[in-house]
């Protein structure tokens, strides 16, 4: 995690920055999944209500250069500006950037559990009475599942600043429940 590169989504009259960031992130997800290394993490330096127009990729110089050699942004190069792979500047701290899955529709989840054979209909009805819908105000990207083609919101949490880094692997989204990225 000693290098990074930054991609900025450029303003466009036809496409919102959220739409372009989601398209960029979907391409990143595909290439990170194909690499299967778990050595590149992401952060959104402008995160607020939405992730913002900047995406940072964190990793070793070798990992980031290998990623860039794959020309994974093909088709989006006119819509974004990318920095070269650069050493990390002075670090303010370390941060976990993770995915949060919100169970927003208990009825749908219980129907799925019955269909899969995990619960009987009676058990599902009992549980439905006790389960409440979950909501979150975390920033998100609108994504499309590659396997089912269903649309979903990928909620992203930037954890508190930590004093020490935590090693670990990153998912094909560049997110981790435990591993940290440098925050600067």
From Swiss-Prot:
Pfam families: Cas_Csy4 (PF09618). Its EC number is 3.1.-.-. Coiled coil: none annotated. The lineage of its organism: Bacteria, Pseudomonadati, Pseudomonadota, Gammaproteobacteria, Enterobacterales. The keyword Nucleotide-binding does not apply. Keywords: Antiviral defense, Endonuclease, Hydrolase, Nuclease, RNA-binding. InterPro entries: CRISPR-assoc_prot_Csy4 (IPR013396), CRISPR-Cas6/Csy4_sf (IPR042564). GO terms for molecular function: endonuclease activity; RNA binding. One of its GO terms (biological process) is defense response to virus. It comes from the Bacteria. This is CRISPR-associated endonuclease Cas6/Csy4. The gene is cas6f. Belongs to the CRISPR-associated endoribonuclease Cas6 family. Cas6f/Csy4, subtype I-F/Ypest subfamily. NCBIfam families: cas_Csy4. CRISPR (clustered regularly interspaced short palindromic repeat) is an adaptive immune system that provides protection against mobile genetic elements (viruses, transposable elements and conjugative plasmids). CRISPR clusters contain sequences complementary to antecedent mobile elements and target invading nucleic acids. CRISPR clusters are transcribed and processed into CRISPR RNA (crRNA). Processes pre-crRNA into individual crRNA units. Complements a csy4 disruption in Pseudomonas aeruginosa PA14, restoring inhibition of biofilm formation and generation of crRNA. Changing residue 29 to A: Does not complement Pseudomonas aeruginosa csy4 deletion, no production of crRNA. The keyword 4Fe-4S does not apply.
């Amino acid at each position: 995690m000693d290098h990074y590169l930054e991609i900025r989504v450029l303003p466009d009259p036809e496409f919102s920055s959220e739409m372009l960031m989601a398209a960029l992130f979907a391409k990143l997800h595909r290439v990170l999944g194909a690499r299967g290394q778990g050595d590149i993490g992401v952060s959104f330096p402008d995160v607020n209500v939405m992730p913002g127009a900047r995406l940072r990729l964190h990793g070793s110089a070798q990992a980031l250069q290998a990623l860039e050699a794959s020309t994974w942004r093909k088709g989006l190069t006119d819509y974004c500006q990318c920095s070269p792979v650069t050493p990390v500047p002075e670090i303010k701290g370390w941060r976990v950037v993770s995915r949060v899955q919100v169970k927003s529709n208990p009825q749908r989840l219980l129907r799925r559990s019955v269909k899969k054979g995990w619960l009987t209909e009676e058990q599902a009805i009992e549980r439905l009475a006790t389960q409440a819908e979950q909501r979150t105000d975390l920033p998100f990207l609108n994504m499309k599942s590659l396997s089912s083609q269903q649309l979903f919101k990928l909620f992203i949490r930037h954890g508190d600043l930590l004093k020490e880094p935590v090693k670990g692997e990153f998912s094909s989204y560049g997110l981790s429940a435990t591993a940290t990225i440098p925050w600067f």
